[in-house]
Design a protein with these regions (language model features):
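Acidic helix N-cap motif at the loop->helix transition within catalytic regions
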Residues: 14-17, 42-51, 94, 98
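Cell-envelope/extracellular polymer assembly enzymes that use nucleotide-activated donors
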Residues: 2-4, 22, 32, 174
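A conserved acidic beta->alpha catalytic loop
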Residues: 22, 37-46, 67, 90
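Flexible acidic/His/Gly-enriched loops in nucleotide-sugar-dependent glycosyltransferase catalytic domains
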Residues: 57, 67-70, 78, 99-156, ...
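C-terminal subregions of glycosyltransferases and related glycan-biosynthesis enzymes
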Residues: 195-309
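Short aromatic/hydrophobic "clamp" motif used to bind/position activated sugar donors
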Residues: 86
Length: 309
């Protein structure tokens, strides 16, 4: 079993050494490392070149990708990869010892291995994120592992054309939803062998909140139509509608017309009523039940503005 590691790099001079060291810890299962610099303006390239010089036993190649964004950087070497598996790894994240080998052993013929991970905040506090057992619901609620904690079968990634470089946010769940829709199989593990480190700034893919929430909500609506709506499990459908509703509430702040359109085309036809446990304000629930979503959100926006003044 062989694995290629793909690391997009953008202004990570303080992180990439430790990241590459964590890849080296994986041992012989890694047969190739691809570092892809994505327009770094710091000393990232020099640090990588120095690491290559100091680790002649590692099969590593440094590419440069001028198209901005993590998706373009991750796609750069895909056509060259002949390993059975791909480990995508952000340059500020870490793999703990045996992460990859344990996932290969536990893959059981699946196409995507999704796993728990440690999320380390900027204050160094850590929490463990455990993924959903239900794959479809995990995609809906953004809880199906992480780009770096998961392991991806190369042929599955190539068959769907890799990462969507037009997707400015929600990239990993766009990828996961396409893989699921294509009929690929998923295996859940709970090894927790990846550390995802938060950074205040400097990540490759960042954008404005309006676009982020438009992408997030549209992706879930599309997945609901293609997959969830066809399921017979009413609890999964209800949970998915609740997720879409929560997304529209945030989206309403940035794009009220789109939020209302999604309500009218998805939530209303399914006779959706917000669960009491998801709404803090009884007044909102009362307004919603009597006057509907549009008026309830408009009133909530007015009240929020009054509180902030």
């Amino acid at each position: 079993m062989s694995v290629s590691v793909v690391i997009p790099c953008y202004n990570v001079e303080d992180y990439i050494d430790e990241c590459l060291d964590s890849v080296k810890l994986q041992g012989e299962c890694v047969d190739k490392i691809f570092c892809v610099d994505n327009n770094s303006s710091d000393n990232t390239i020099n640090v990588i070149e120095k690491w290559i010089e100091n680790n002649p036993d590692q099969n590593i190649t440094l590419f440069k990708e001028t198209k901005p964004g993590a998706c373009a950087a991750r796609n750069k070497p895909i056509d060259l990869i002949q390993s059975e598996w791909i480990q995508f790894l952000d340059a500020d994240d870490l793999l703990l010892e045996d992460k990859i080998s344990l996932q290969i052993k536990g893959s059981h013929g699946s196409d995507i291995v999704y796993d728990s991970f440690i999320k380390r905040g900027t204050d160094n506090n850590e929490i463990v994120i455990i993924p959903n057992i239900d794959v479809a619901l995990g995609i809906m609620e953004s809880n199906l592992g992480n780009t770096c904690s998961n392991l991806w079968r190369t042929v599955a990634i190539k068959d769907i054309g890799g990462w969507d470089e037009k997707q400015t946010s929600s990239q990993e769940y766009d990828l996961l939803s396409r893989l699921y829709h294509q009929g690929n199989s998923f295996q859940r593990l709970d090894n927790c062998k990846t550390i995802i480190r938060e950074r205040v700034s400097g990540q490759i893919s960042q954008g404005n909140q309006k676009l982020i929430w438009e992408n997030y909500t549209n992706l879930r609506v599309s997945f609901f139509k293609q997959v969830i709506q066809k399921q017979k499990d009413s609890s999964v459908i209800q949970k998915s509608l609740t997720i879409i509703f929560g997304a529209t509430q945030i989206l309403y702040k940035y794009n009220p017309d789109l939020a209302v359109k999604i309500y009218d085309t998805i939530l209303k036809p399914n006779h959706f009523i917000p669960p009491v446990t998801t709404i803090k304000s009884r007044f909102y629930l009362l307004t919603y039940s009597i006057l509907g979503y549009r008026f309830a959100e408009r009133l909530r926006t007015i009240l929020r503005k009054l509180k902030s003044t």
